[in-house]
């Protein structure tokens, strides 16, 4: 059984944990760097990216998360989590992990009142997926190895590079678990080899 952590510093981490547990994995709410060993994957929820950076300042999260990824851990980021994963952040610039070769602009889809729900075409996810956009960021540039799995009005909103999956929307606010299930397939090899045990 895969052990998937959900960074529980802010955002709707409980909804992510519930979705993952419903798929049969062990979901762990992660609040300390010391909880990373033993995990096969980690979900970084949405919220507010500058607030998340402030909350992460109390522990060495950046080197720990980079090390987790380098050792083969799968990482999924939603909305603010996607911002944190990006190589470059603009509007305004801010620190990020650089685990995903994209340039991402904060709050590019508008204010809270501009939030919306839609259905996205995503053949690799089983046809379509439901998506909730809340002050969503915009992916402005993609590296050569980044694959677009779903787009909205021609713009990438769900991307993958190796063992990193990122989306500018909130899948945890829908009834679907397709994206969480896909992430489990990304994390499964680590679970099978036990490389983090």
Question: Where are the model-predicted features located?
Answer:
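Hydrophobic anchor at the start of a short beta-strand
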Residues: 27-28, 75, 164
């Amino acid at each position: 059984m895969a052990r998937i952590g959900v960074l529980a510093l802010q955002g709707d981490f409980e909804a992510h944990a519930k979705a993952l547990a419903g798929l049969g994995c062990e979901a762990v709410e992660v609040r300390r760097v010391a909880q990373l060993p033993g995990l096969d994957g980690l979900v970084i929820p949405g919220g507010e990216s500058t607030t998340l950076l402030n909350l992460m300042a109390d522990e060495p999260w950046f080197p720990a998360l980079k090390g987790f990824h380098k050792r083969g851990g799968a990482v999924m980021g939603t909305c603010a989590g996607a911002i944190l994963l990006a190589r470059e952040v603009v509007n305004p610039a801010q620190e990020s992990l650089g685990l995903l070769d994209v340039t991402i602009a904060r709050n590019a889809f508008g204010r809270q009142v501009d939030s919306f729900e839609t259905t996205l075409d995503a053949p690799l996810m089983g046809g379509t997926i439901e998506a909730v956009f809340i002050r969503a960021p915009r992916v402005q540039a993609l590296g050569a190895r980044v694959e677009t799995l779903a787009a909205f009005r021609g713009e990438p909103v769900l991307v993958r590079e190796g063992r990193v999956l990122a989306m500018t929307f909130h899948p945890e606010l829908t009834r679907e678990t397709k994206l969480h299930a896909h992430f489990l397939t990304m994390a499964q090899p680590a679970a099978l080899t036990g490389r983090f045990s």
